[in-house]
């Protein structure tokens, strides 16, 4: 039995007691965690609610404290409850049987495998334009999305992870312009170039630099100048070729460029433990006529109209009220421009309808990448797949989370409202914008990465990146810098490790540092990334939490197997041996015992925190909890002689608690995407 299940058992007992004793049906029973363990493990303010309901039903006025006294005896009958006290005007404070619960928590619970039978939820994240290498802003998106996926799965949800590939957009077109008109390369020459590049300067890095050159090319070499309309025509020519697709040589060149960038980006994300189920390509949405189908559905539903006058004459728009009335938000409601081209909002509505299984069309599919652990990444395609292809069913989710930065809040609102207008029965709540703020760099981080700063920039709290200007930090460079810093720390702490083990450990520490730093701030917070702060082994950091888990493993490596086995046997005796139960209860009593018990109770809140994170869509809460658990275990480790304790019962309790913390802390870190190395 988990702590959550025990709490539910107590709630149900109160419902039964309220029904049988007072003839009142409670819809829900709220519970609170007392601020200190000596006040109880769980408090129910239900007596006050019952007093109101009884008066409404019978007109009789009852004292909440008297109601609490009648409920008290019912709760005391539960095996896992040691005692119940009534506090104040009628609070019911429940004290658990610490010894029994320790024995219960020491036995690992089997994971719930019912997710396959549950309605599917979908999370789209990362979704980087495939025109160059990923940067630090993309990493925040990917880490947030990946962690939220892990949270949903831990909460028992069935999840499909999608990565939208905008391979027909302006950004890809600009890089194609660069290859064709600046580099003077055809497809074969680009392939030869790609093959010649080394591991330190990969294809996505080359495209990064080329993209910056194209931006200057459009402005005749002057960054602040207006764009040359004649040169911008080259972009439009490429965009038309991408729309045509098929055997168009420019479209084929663009497909190679986009696909290679996707492969490089996937390699970057793999370094952070981030994977996907499906790559949904915009070219396939275009060529399989998803938009035409969505346009028809929108016309039939009467949610789109063609403007005949004013500045939007000739455009198809959704006539929703703007919440700000700004020109920018008015333009977001345009679905088809007067020249017949579809806006991003229009394409997003078509894609969202497909994700929710309401479009009436589907993609064709192919395997894009197979991972060594059996995970397969699929990609959409326009061509019909081979007959008998065994693949998962994609799309058809009941809820879709789109991880997109907060600047897209209003367009995402339009998408949700547009989909709900076409299919009213699913409502706007089926489309959830998982928004977040930007990530920048601290001035110190910029200097570590070799970015030149002016005196004015050095005085700023953070430096904002700009991909088009070439002012940015590639994700791989960021990871490499973190690995170098982590390696120096690992070499200092563990000089006896082999070079391979040092590098492997440094990688895990670097990933922990980066992921935790990006997760510990709430989504609506602008982050200024700082290497020194992220890599610190002290304070609220990934390495600190990691080190606490490493320490639990170190304890069990040092303990003799027979000592651990004896501890397990003794703890198992609690359930059927009253004398042993009393001895364990004695260890967990008093001020010192209560501190140990508080740590155990904190560890058992993980399930509740996971559910809270799922409901609030805020991974930062799990990061904060993980740090709290790591910090509490560190205090426990320093306060108790786990390895040298002579008393058998006390030693067994300390070992059992350490084992519980190891399980819960490792699980929490895993959901954050952080592995626990052997040594640090």
Task: Enumerate the predicted regions with their spans.
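Non-catalytic interaction-recognition regions
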Residues: 2-102, 115-680
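Short, charged, solvent-exposed linker or helix-capping segments at domain edges/interfaces
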Residues: 103-108
């Amino acid at each position: 039995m988990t702590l959550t299940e025990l709490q539910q058992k107590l709630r149900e007992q109160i419902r039964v007691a309220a029904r049988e004793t007072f003839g009142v049906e409670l819809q829900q029973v709220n519970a609170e965690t007392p601020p200190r363990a000596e006040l109880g493990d769980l408090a129910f303010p239900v007596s006050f609610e019952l007093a109101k309901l009884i008066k409404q039903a019978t007109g009789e006025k009852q004292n909440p404290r008297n109601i609490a006294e009648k409920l008290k005896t019912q709760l005391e009958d539960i095996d896992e409850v040691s005692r119940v006290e009534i506090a104040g005007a009628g609070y019911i404070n429940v004290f658990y049987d610490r010894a029994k619960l320790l024995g219960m928590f020491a036995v690992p619970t089997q994971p719930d495998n019912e997710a396959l039978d549950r309605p599917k939820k979908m999370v789209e994240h990362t979704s980087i334009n495939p025109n160059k290498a990923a940067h630090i802003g993309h990493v925040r998106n990917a880490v947030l999305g990946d962690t939220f996926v892990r949270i949903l799965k831990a909460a028992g949800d069935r999840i499909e992870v999608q990565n939208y590939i905008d391979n027909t957009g302006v950004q890809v077109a600009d890089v194609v312009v660069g290859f064709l008109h600046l580099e003077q390369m055809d497809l074969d020459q680009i392939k030869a170039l790609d093959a010649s590049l080394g591991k330190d300067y990969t294809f996505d890095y080359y495209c990064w630099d080329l993209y910056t050159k194209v931006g200057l090319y459009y402005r005749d070499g002057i960054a602040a100048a207006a764009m040359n309309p004649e040169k911008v025509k080259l972009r439009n020519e490429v965009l038309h070729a991408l729309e045509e697709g098929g055997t168009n040589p420019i479209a084929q060149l663009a497909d190679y460029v986009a696909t290679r960038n996707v492969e490089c980006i996937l390699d970057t994300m793999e370094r952070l433990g981030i994977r996907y189920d499906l790559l949904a390509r915009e070219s396939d949405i275009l060529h399989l006529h998803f938009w035409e189908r969505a346009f028809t559905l929108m016309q039939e539903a009467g949610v789109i109209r063609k403007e005949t006058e004013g500045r939007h004459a000739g455009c198809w728009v959704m006539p929703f009220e703007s919440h700000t009335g700004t020109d920018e938000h008015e333009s977001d409601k345009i679905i088809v421009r007067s020249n017949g081209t579809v806006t991003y909002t229009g394409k997003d509505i078509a894609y969202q309808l497909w994700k929710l299984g309401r479009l009436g069309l589907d993609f064709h599919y192919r395997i894009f990448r197979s991972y060594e652990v059996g995970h397969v990444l699929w990609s959409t395609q326009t061509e019909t797949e081979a007959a008998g292809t065994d693949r998962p069913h994609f799309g058809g989710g009941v809820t879709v989370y789109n991880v997109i930065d907060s600047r897209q809040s209003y367009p995402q609102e339009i998408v949700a409202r547009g989909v709900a207008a076409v299919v009213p029965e699913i409502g706007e709540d089926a489309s959830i914008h998982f928004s977040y703020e930007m990530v920048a760099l601290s001035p110190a981080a910029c200097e570590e990465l070799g970015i030149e700063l002016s005196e004015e920039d050095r005085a700023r709290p953070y430096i904002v990146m700009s991909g088009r200007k070439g002012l940015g930090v590639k994700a791989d460079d960021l990871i490499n810098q973190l690995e170098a810093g982590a390696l120096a720390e690992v070499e200092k702490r563990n000089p006896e490790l082999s070079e391979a083990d040092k590098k492997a450990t440094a990688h895990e520490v670097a990933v922990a540092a980066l992921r935790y730093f990006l997760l510990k701030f709430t989504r609506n917070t602008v982050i200024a990334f700082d290497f020194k702060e992220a890599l610190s082994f002290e304070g609220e950091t990934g390495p600190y939490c990691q080190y606490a888990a490493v320490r639990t493993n170190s304890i069990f490596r040092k303990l003799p197997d027979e000592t651990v086995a004896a501890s397990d046997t003794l703890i198992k005796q609690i359930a059927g041996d009253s004398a042993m139960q009393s001895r364990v209860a004695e260890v967990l009593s008093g001020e010192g015992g209560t501190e140990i018990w508080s740590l155990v109770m904190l560890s058992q809140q993980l399930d509740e925190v996971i559910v809270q994170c799922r409901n609030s869509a805020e991974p930062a809460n799990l990061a904060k909890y993980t740090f709290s658990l790591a910090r509490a275990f560190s205090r426990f480790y320093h306060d108790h002689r786990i390895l040298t304790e002579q008393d058998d019962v006390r030693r067994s309790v300390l070992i059992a608690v350490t084992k519980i913390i190891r399980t819960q802390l490792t699980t929490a870190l895993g959901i954050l995407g952080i592995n626990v190395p052997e040594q640090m």
